[in-house]
């Protein structure tokens, strides 16, 4: 069995601020095959590497990426992070990040397109122009939850490798996993009477579930800006069978990158996608137990926050 490619999610994020040049370099030093990064658009149509639409990374700035200019974002100081001092660290532009990774021997790049909050037909062409200029060629894979943007990129650059990101089953996403219910001591409220004695516990349980659902809804909405809830639900329903969905698309797809629980819902997923010529990545694979569960399925890639440990976990799983 071929060992999966290891892609460091936003770089080595426990050693440096995520999505920074230092995080990318550390990931390769630790043995990752490549890095994943996120590109989004600034107020003045610049292209910056950052995951969330909000500024984070422990800065004192409270603002949205799309409300700031490229220059304002480049001026944000990231030299102090988690008690560690960095000589120079800032949010890289797309051009800077691609040029840097191009110079890291053997480094592949998974570049995620973050859709602009407001429609901008020129967003994808701007990204494609910089991809061409980088010279990364087949070392770059463009991925996104917004598959219409990938289609646009593929039309502009037919040789570009693209991969669709998928979330999996909407119902299974919205509620806490069974193990969490057990760990929190939660029970099905229908198992007991709604009397005064157990109402406080049920109220606490409802609060935890509501908080989980709220967080998941916020996540989903952020992945699909410009879309209504009805449109998002329809989109996710269309993707419930990834292999059938890929075959319905009007452009060729090189990779399907799935939230890893998708494989537990359909253990034949990797085989089904391989049968139609698609490689398969799972994200975000961060524990030994998950590696042990996924490895026998034959995935082509693990996207992970733990590039320091995952090869050890793979070796241990293969030795079992």
Where are these regions (language model features)?
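Phosphate-group recognition and catalysis centered on beta-loop-alpha active-site segments
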Residues: 1-320
């Amino acid at each position: 069995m071929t060992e999966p490619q290891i892609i460091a999610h936003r770089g080595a994020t426990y050693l440096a601020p995520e999505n920074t040049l230092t995080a990318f370099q550390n990931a390769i030093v630790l043995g990752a095959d490549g890095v994943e990064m996120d590109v989004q658009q600034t107020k003045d149509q610049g292209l910056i590497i950052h995951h969330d639409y909000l500024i984070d990374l422990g800065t004192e700035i409270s603002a949205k990426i799309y409300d700031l200019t490229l220059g304002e974002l480049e001026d944000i100081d990231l030299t102090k992070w988690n008690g560690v001092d960095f000589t120079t660290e800032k949010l890289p532009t797309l051009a800077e990040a691609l040029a840097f990774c191009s110079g890291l021997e053997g480094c592949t790049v998974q570049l995620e397109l973050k859709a602009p909050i407001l429609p901008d037909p020129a967003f994808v062409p701007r990204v494609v122009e910089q991809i061409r200029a980088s010279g990364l060629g087949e070392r770059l894979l463009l991925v996104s939850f917004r598959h219409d943007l990938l289609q646009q990129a593929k039309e502009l650059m037919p040789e570009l490798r693209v991969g669709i990101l998928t979330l999996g089953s909407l119902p299974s996403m919205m509620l806490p996993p069974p193990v969490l219910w057990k760990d929190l001591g939660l029970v099905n409220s229908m198992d007991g009477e709604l009397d005064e004695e157990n109402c406080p516990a049920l109220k606490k349980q409802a609060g935890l579930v509501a908080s989980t659902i709220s967080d998941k809804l916020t996540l989903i909405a952020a992945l699909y800006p410009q879309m209504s809830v009805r449109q998002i639900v329809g989109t996710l329903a269309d993707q419930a069978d990834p292999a059938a969905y890929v075959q319905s698309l009007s452009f060729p797809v090189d990779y399907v990158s799935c939230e890893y629980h998708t494989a537990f819902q359909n253990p034949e997923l990797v085989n089904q996608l391989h049968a139609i010529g698609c490689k398969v990545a799972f994200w975000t694979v961060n524990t030994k137990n998950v590696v042990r569960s996924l490895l026998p399925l034959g995935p082509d890639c693990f996207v992970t926050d733990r590039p320091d440990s995952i090869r050890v976990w793979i070796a241990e799983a293969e030795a079992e």
